[in-house]
């Protein structure tokens, strides 16, 4: 009797972001990105954003995502190329993003022969109920923001169930708050 076991050498639960023409995006242009939160967000929401960033920083062993203590006052702002990295909250009703919980808008440019991210904005859709405690009355900010931070670093959605970068979530979900081995 012969038994052969086959194990994959590595398993990752992510896909690399691509441009509209299919070119790979090779992560951040700079070694880190500093972002500002909107001053209309609660302190608990800013903490949730910070904790989401720490998940990725801890995984990479570097401070890739730096949450500035300075806040911005620009509400109702869709992602735009203005050389700033802003997190804001607004209604997305009437836009092509109306069904999205959050929208991450990366700007990538060609540097030499590689596309790299030079700027990223995130909009929290205020048309959905948000919570910071895992309550089933709303979507958990840290849960969704950890996923969006992956996009900020150049990752795309995956088909791997229970990976942080899988598309979609439910009210009260908190399992995407932390990264797993495959992320």
Predicted regions and their residues:
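Bacterial N-terminal signal peptides
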Residues: 1-6
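Zinc-dependent metalloendopeptidases
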Residues: 9-183
């Amino acid at each position: 009797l012969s038994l052969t076991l086959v194990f994959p050498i590595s398993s990752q639960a992510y896909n690399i972001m691509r441009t509209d023409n299919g070119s790979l995006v090779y992560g951040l242009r700079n070694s880190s990105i500093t972002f500002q939160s909107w001053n209309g967000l609660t302190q608990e929401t800013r903490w949730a954003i910070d904790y989401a960033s720490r998940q990725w920083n801890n995984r990479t062993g570097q401070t890739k995502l730096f949450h500035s203590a300075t806040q911005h006052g620009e509400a109702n702002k869709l992602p735009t190329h203005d050389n700033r990295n802003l997190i804001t909250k607004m209604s997305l009703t009437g836009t092509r993003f109306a069904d999205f919980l959050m929208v991450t808008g990366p700007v990538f440019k060609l540097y030499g022969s590689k596309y790299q991210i030079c700027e990223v904005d995130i909009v929290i859709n205020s048309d959905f109920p948000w919570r910071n405690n895992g309550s089933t009355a709303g979507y958990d900010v840290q849960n969704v923001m950890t996923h969006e931070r992956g996009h900020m670093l150049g990752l795309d959605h995956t088909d791997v169930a229970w990976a942080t970068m899988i598309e979609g979530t439910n009210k009260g979900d908190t399992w995407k708050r932390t990264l797993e081995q495959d992320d």
